[in-house]
């Protein structure tokens, strides 16, 4: 950026020293090319305040010279370099009013106007720097909102996946409950079946014992009693 600012300032000096219309037109074209490069670097790179002030001062001087050139062309006056025009004005003032007091007053007025121009340029540069900071903050806020939107979308997808898994687990739990209930019923029926089978087995055993062992002994005992 420093090289571009130096080129802008050198081009402003060349514009001020231009002695013909063709030369100043060429310098205007070259200045505009350098100006485009400076605008790009100023937009996409971090620039210090003094560099912004130099940039604004060079651009304002270019605008002033361009306006002066257009006024000269519109009025039909010949183009003169800044130094020659100032010397011409001083010579005319010395002829018309050679007093030192008036010259000092006029020089003070000129210096005051330059100081006011510097104040305006400083204010404009500060506003430009503030706008650049606001632009950077807005870009950062947009990036943060985009990141938050991406995180929110990712969280939404995760919640949807968890919801689907929850519904799947709920279906599995419902099916498992039905299976457990049917297994309990099966266990109860099996228990009754086993108990009834065991009871029948005991009955058969008791019947056989009574029929084969107890009854013959009992019948013999009853026969002797008769």
UniProtKB/Swiss-Prot annotation:
**Can you say where in the cell this protein is located?**
Endoplasmic reticulum membrane
Sorted keywords for this record are: Coiled coil, Endoplasmic reticulum, ER-Golgi transport, Membrane, Phosphoprotein, Protein transport, Transmembrane, Transmembrane helix, Transport
Q: Which InterPro entries match?
A: Sec20, Sec20_C
Biological process (GO) annotations held by this record are:
intracellular protein transport; retrograde vesicle-mediated transport, Golgi to endoplasmic reticulum
Show which residues sit on the Cytoplasmic side of the membrane: 1-189
Q: Which GO MF terms are attached to this record?
A: SNAP receptor activity
Which residues lie in coiled coils? 53-75
Highest taxon of source: Eukaryota
Ranges of the Lumenal topological domain? 211-226
Q: Which is an annotated Pfam family here? A: Sec20
Query: How does it sit in the bilayer?
Result: Single-pass type IV membrane protein
Q: Which GO terms describe its cellular component?
A: cytoplasm; endoplasmic reticulum; endoplasmic reticulum membrane; Golgi apparatus; SNARE complex
Q: Which residues cross the membrane?
A: 190-210
> Where are the Phosphoserine residues found in this chain?
97
Q: What function does this protein fulfil?
A: SNARE required for targeting and fusion of Golgi-derived retrograde transport vesicles with the ER.
Fill in the subunit field for this protein: Component of a SNARE complex consisting of ufe1, sec20, sec22 and use1. Interacts with tip20 through its cytoplasmic domain.
Its family remark reads: Belongs to the SEC20 family.
The name this protein carries in UniProt is Protein transport protein sec20
Q: Species name for this entry?
A: Schizosaccharomyces pombe (strain 972 / ATCC 24843)
